[in-house]
Amino acid sequence: MRRILAAAVLAFAFASCEKSTGEIGLDFVDGSQFAFGTKSEVAMRTHTEAFDSLVTLRPAALLVGSYQDPIFGRPTASFATQLVLSSVAPDFGANPTVDSVFMILPYAGWYGDTTAAFQIKVQRSDSALTDSVYYAFSTAAAGETLCDTSFVPKAGVKTLRTGTRVGETSMFLKLSRQKFQEWIVDASTANPSVLESNAAFLDYFNGLIVSGGPNNETMYQFNPGDASAKVRIFYTNDSIRADTSTAGLDYGVYDLLWTSGVQSFNMITHDRSQASFDLAAQDTVLGESSVYIQGLGGAVTVLNLDGLRALRDSGYVVNYAELVVPVREGSNLKYQAPGGLSVLQVKGSAKTLIRDYQRGSVGGTFSASGVLRKGAYRFEITRHVQDLLGLDTTSSYRMMLIPERMASSPLRAVLHGNADAVEPMSLNLWYTKPN
């Protein structure tokens, strides 16, 4: 049975005359086996905020694209990356000519309508990528355009029972051969010092910016950790052209790499003009009936655990604490919910994982069932609650829920807030009174 704050306060106020030792429950071992004793629900307030200052430097996936979400509006992603030489001081032979150039982008995932046409553009970066920290709001100046095309990607990594692979594992973009003739092949003889080391090359060539068109309805994720993440230059020279034997080469190959280790970052914007909720009008006094989670810094849920303040000197021992976060039924049919969430404690501008993570997993995995994907996230936060009820008077009663892989995944979810009339988000405590 759900109990509101008043009931919780009355239940604990009975023992408020007993002096607290200041070490409430700290010697207990966390675990659901300790969910015994009296159960009570703690009052809280929930609302939604944007996540400021999301670091997107060297993310697990680089993103391009956008889509119109009827609830969250339109998120848009692009990325900038350095390129490095596959070998220094390349020798392209006599009279080399670039035949073609392709940028290979290994798929890591996608979100949205994969049957829709997708516009994508590749440009040389006019901004050097330094050792600075890059955020979602960081930008890079785009220079000369190397590719601007629209097509329907055939992304897929499924393998049928027959062993036949469906779809392509990478996106291939044809870049301007004339530009790479000038910048790489001709430079190998006209200005060889820029190719003598990767340090010299990075001073010479800032990198690439990859972005999407304004009407895309998909966001694609690409894996910089894949060995096939590269720009591949196909070329011929006098020797290759003169060899007409069947065993002879048709072309030479040289690669510029954008694999893990180079500087790269995601650039993110959110247009919430068509969103179904307003971040500027959140009820932070009473809380909201629906709250929101969105990757790429789009939305996070803030919890104020007001009910715990009244319990600090109760003298009761909290054996187990569970946070239950229901997902709005039917909200994740078209757009997938995150596989997991994390819980942060918020102290001023500082955001850190709660102490329960020091002992391993606290849960937070999404479990759903039924046609409408009904489910919830569940967290064991016993140690954090014990800390808040202990002597640490500097503890903050604010927590934050964030999606996993927030810098590289757009997954989102609609959650039940504390003001939901049927199944609100809840913090349940199991407690006992020491003799």
Give names to the regions the model predicted.
Residues R2-N435:
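Secreted, disulfide-rich extracellular signaling modules
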